[in-house]
């Protein structure tokens, strides 16, 4: 299939394998969920009654005081006591096979093409790391909210865009399924598009 170039005459030919697949919502959901789960820190922790400091001595004798029986001041029933079912650090990551991941990326790229959310440009470079220059460039392309994927990550481009909300600049190797679906548009250079096509072929 051919994709039109924005801001220039001509088209770029891409493989149907990577850019003309049926949308598989269930697969995309599974891969995105797995990606977000893997990003969780999973470091929350609470102490059980045996881990809270103190409470080794029985606070009062078993019988005769008239008070309810107690064996430790760190019981979950007591203030400053342990937690009954204490949370512990855990790994939230979910396994996704490489074949599934690639298939999900193909279906996401294909859906971007179908929804006209993929903008292809010949190249994208700035003369200086100035935010004003970057905003002007985006205005030319009529883009406000976008993931920008470049084959050769230009320092000027990265520095000019890093302070702008709703814009992210990546190279082709560091894109992920969440970033692809999070923005209104995906602006990609021809070189980056070829790298993506090669990775998903």
From Swiss-Prot:
Q: Which organism is it from?
A: Marinomonas sp. (strain MWYL1)
Print the keywords alphabetically: Ribonucleoprotein, Ribosomal protein, RNA-binding, rRNA-binding
- Could you say which protein family the record assigns here? Belongs to the universal ribosomal protein uL4 family.
The encoding gene: rplD
Q: Which molecular-function annotations from GO does this UniProt entry contain? A: rRNA binding; structural constituent of ribosome
Q: What is this protein called?
A: Large ribosomal subunit protein uL4
Entry's Gene Ontology BP terms: translation
Assembly and partners are described as:
Part of the 50S ribosomal subunit.
Sum up the protein's function in the record's words.
Answer: One of the primary rRNA binding proteins, this protein initially binds near the 5'-end of the 23S rRNA. It is important during the early stages of 50S assembly. It makes multiple contacts with different domains of the 23S rRNA in the assembled 50S subunit and ribosome.
Q: Where is this region: Disordered?
A: 39-67
Pfam families with a match to the protein in the record: Ribosomal_L4
Show the GO cellular component annotation of the record.
Answer: ribonucleoprotein complex; ribosome
Q: What NCBIfam families does this protein's entry cite?
A: rplD_bact (TIGR03953)
